[in-house]
Curated annotation (Swiss-Prot):
Keyword ATP-binding: yes
Record-given protein name: Formate--tetrahydrofolate ligase
HAMAP family: FTHFS
Family under the similarity heading: Belongs to the formate--tetrahydrofolate ligase family.
InterPro entries found in the cross-reference section: Formate_THF_ligase, Formate_THF_ligase_CS, P-loop_NTPase
Lineage: Bacteria, Pseudomonadati, Pseudomonadota, Alphaproteobacteria, Hyphomicrobiales
Gene3D superfamilies on file: Domain 2, N(10)-formyltetrahydrofolate synthetase, Formyltetrahydrofolate synthetase, domain 3, P-loop containing nucleotide triphosphate hydrolases
Enzyme's top EC category: ligase
Amino acid sequence: MASDIEIAQRATMERITKVAAEKLGIDDEHLEPYGHFKAKISLDYVDSLKDRPDGKLILVTAISPTPAGEGKTTTTVGLGDALNRIGKKASICLREPSLGPVFGMKGGAAGGGYAQVVPMEDINLHFTGDFSAIALATNLLAAMIDNHIHHGNELNIDVRRIAWKRVVDMNDRALRDITIALGGTANGFPRQDGFDIVVASEVMAIFCLANSIEDLKARLGAIVIGYTTDQKPVHARDLQANGAMAVLLKNALKPNLVQTLENNPAFIHGGPFANIAHGCNSVLATKTALKLSDYVVTEAGFGADLGAEKFIDIKCRKSGLRPQAVVIVATIRALKYHGGVELKELNTENLDALRKGLSNLERHINNIRNHYGLPVVVAINHFTADTAAEVDLLKKSVADLGAPIVVCRHWAEGGKGAEDLARVVVEMIDKVPSDFHFVYEDSASLWDKATAVATKLYGATKVTADAKVRNQIKKLEESGYGNFPICIAKTQYSFSTDAKLRGAPTGHDINIREVRLAAGAEFIVLVCGDVMTMPGLPKIPSATKIDLNEKGEVVGLF
């Protein structure tokens, strides 16, 4: 079978104006094309949709992944195409890929096989420039902080307690801890600093949670960049930075529209990581899709313990969105991985390891059903190495849990390979009522919120933290931030904070080692374990395989 990029480059794309008009009813005047196959949708048009009824929202999540990923994006695309094939008016909503993972381990993030979004190279490489705008807005604020200090520090900012970092959309471990403003007094006040990857930035989170330009500007102004020497918070609005930041973001905030290989609409907008941020595409894009479609399929990053938890406890809580069904993507290879099989042996049949690894899937199913009250269907993303015995064992085991299960072949067959999944999802939405609720209430203390997620979803015994972290949490509550939801930053490979603990571990502790206030995004980041907000490249980055051929075509994306 051809590679992902070969399939994408052979695709027959429709002009995006045609997709918008025929599939969504959007007139040309409301589109801002970026070439023939990408467009932004005007915010005036988005606002004009507010009184329309919403379609049905379907969340695609997954079991705890292997390092290779398990096909959430592929399944989201395949399910969206399948819904259209069975006569439903459906759109999909995805995050924009970050260049860090594209050039690092993933090599691309636009689906796979015959379940992709296109133009694939453009989507993976710069797209419409949204991430550049987000990085520029973040770095403008950083520059204004250091400039203010250099010119007398009227706000009395404590240079030891600046909480704002610069960002770049690249995996670059050398930038994690640096010293800036060296070289003499003309270059500013030297201090220790560092970079985050742009998808971990607060501006990215604000961008994805904002409902309008006005909301965006207010949230940017609420950012706490640090503290004064008498421990009072300093906001971006105190530096008069939020207006200029909003100017940089005003065009980026317009939702992006592209298409699948089967010429169905795809909204791709925003892209925070789910292990170190909240892991969902923009509220504006999701709400726009719901006004224009009967069914909207969206994904949340990594496993359900990270992406789905944050989709529900942060995005849904803040936006009023409510999913009607959840699809949990699982692969036989990942379940064997959770049963103890190493990566190089995952293509070999191993029923014992599969049985053992099923504990991971079972916990994710129970978490969604019991702690969020949502109906669940399991989608098995089929790989050619899966044996009949493994598929039969998995079907029986999931059936014993009382959840519907569908083997999907959208990677090889496109939407046709996910039609059975589409029918099951539609029937479940029609017949199985949801009892939607959150895993914690706004009124709970920050510590109790962390404890609820850790004990109910992760299988942990308790949450721990040293005295410094506990004191930070206490001060945040005293400052009026106790009603914010929490965003736990941890490894995606385990329910615990130890990536080596596979399956469904119990009896572990979740240790909070750092607390970050995201006052503009309106959540509190609790950093647990060894997770980094600036990743590094692997020993052999995907960048070594990405190139231009003699025709000027991109090769090596996958």
